[in-house]
């Protein structure tokens, strides 16, 4: 009986050690992947499109939330501290002064252009109205697909530098992704070229479509200029309504990541319908329309062109 029990215990210990070693091996393999942090869902999605399953990816600002102003969670602090590479937008979105990202990387003892990189590097910056100095940049450069391509190339460059063993995968995925974005950009320009000039006006809550306007030849109007300002004050709303009496667009649009009520007031008082919700600072939740950078841009381009052509 004692011998039999010893054999059973021996077998059990062998299985236990095998499972433990297997589990440890899995954890080691997982930890071997490049640890990447992106500040928001748009940058995270671009990174995922290029890297696939070659990295461990963490996105800081949750889907649907405003990346302009955010309070990092303990998990964000931990992931940032342990990251091999961090991607952020820059140009006045989440950085500068006492901005949340500036404090986050400082506390994590990370170094710019060594540990964290602005994916907007190299774009032609557009400034807020009446401004031209640092800290007054319009951050929404990704709303021009040509800039989205620049973002993607910057991401791929740093992934390759940090993880050269997966260079071939990153280059292959980048090439396919850029081709996809270029095709959509070309289609978008054709769509907006076909719309009458007197119908071209994008009206949104935040004045975030300057890059889009420049790329696709469609002027924009808004209630407030950037989400770090007061949003939807009576003066802002009445000022836009007065403009709309002169311009008379066929449709209004409201962003998925802002309070709808100011634009609903504009719609009610101006008599102009809200045609569609559109995406600016965040992609949609998985499985919903607009759940990737490509999908959100396609949605925006389709809905805006449809609304203006009415």
From Swiss-Prot:
Residues carrying lipid (N-palmitoyl cysteine): 21
Chain residues that bind Fe(2+): 68, 140, 206, 281
GO biological process: cell adhesion; iron ion transport
UniProt subcellular location: Cell membrane
Entry keywords, A to Z: Cell membrane, Ion transport, Iron, Iron transport, Lipoprotein, Membrane, Metal-binding, Palmitate, Signal, Transport
Cysteine disulfide links: none
Pfam families named in the record: ZnuA
Bilayer topology annotation: Lipid-anchor
InterPro entries: AdhesinB, Bact_metal-bind_prot9, Lipoprotein_PsaA-like, ZnuA-like
Highest rank taxon of the organism: Bacteria
MF (Gene Ontology): metal ion binding
Signal peptide: 1-20
Positions of S-diacylglycerol cysteine lipidation: 21
Chief location: membrane
GO annotation, cellular component aspect: plasma membrane
Sequence similarity: Belongs to the bacterial solute-binding protein 9 family. Lipoprotein receptor antigen (Lrai) subfamily.
Protein task: Part of the ATP-binding cassette (ABC) transport system MtsABC involved in iron import. Binds iron with high affinity and specificity and delivers it to the membrane permease for translocation into the cytoplasm. Has low affinity for Zn(2+) and Cu(2+).
Protein name as annotated: Iron ABC transporter substrate-binding lipoprotein MtsA
Organism: Streptococcus pyogenes serotype M6 (strain ATCC BAA-946 / MGAS10394)
């Amino acid at each position: 009986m004692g011998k039999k029990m010893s054999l059973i215990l021996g077998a059990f210990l062998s299985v236990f050690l095998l499972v433990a070693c297997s589990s440890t091996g899995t954890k080691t393999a997982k930890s071997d992947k490049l640890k990447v942090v992106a500040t928001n869902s748009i940058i995270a999605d671009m990174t995922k499109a290029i890297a696939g399953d070659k990295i461990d990816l963490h996105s800081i600002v949750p889907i649907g939330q405003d990346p302009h102003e955010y309070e990092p969670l303990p998990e964000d602090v931990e992931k940032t501290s342990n990251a091999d590479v961090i991607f952020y937008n820059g140009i006045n979105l989440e950085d500068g002064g006492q901005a949340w990202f500036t404090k986050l990387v400082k506390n994590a003892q990370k170094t710019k252009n060594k540990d964290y990189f602005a994916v907007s590097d190299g774009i032609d910056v557009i400034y807020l109205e009446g401004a031209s100095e640092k800290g007054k940049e319009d951050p929404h450069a990704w709303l021009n697909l040509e800039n989205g391509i620049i973002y993607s190339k910057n991401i791929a460059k740093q992934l390759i530098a940090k993880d050269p063993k997966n260079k071939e995968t990153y280059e292959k995925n980048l090439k396919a992704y850029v081709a996809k974005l270029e095709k959509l950009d070309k289609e978008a320009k054709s769509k907006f070229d076909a719309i009458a000039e007197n119908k071209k006006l994008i009206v949104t809550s935040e004045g975030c479509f300057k890059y889009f306007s420049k790329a696709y030849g469609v002027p924009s109007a808004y209630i407030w200029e950037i989400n770090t300002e007061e949003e939807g004050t009576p003066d802002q709303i009445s000022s836009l309504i007065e403009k709309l009496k002169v311009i008379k667009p066929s449709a209004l649009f409201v962003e998925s990541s802002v309070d709808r009520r100011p634009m609903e007031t504009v719609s009610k008082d101006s008599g102009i319908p809200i045609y569609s919700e559109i995406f600016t600072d965040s992609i949609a939740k998985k499985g919903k329309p607009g759940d990737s950078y490509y999908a959100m841009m396609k949605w925006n381009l389709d809905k805006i062109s449809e609304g203006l052509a009415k």
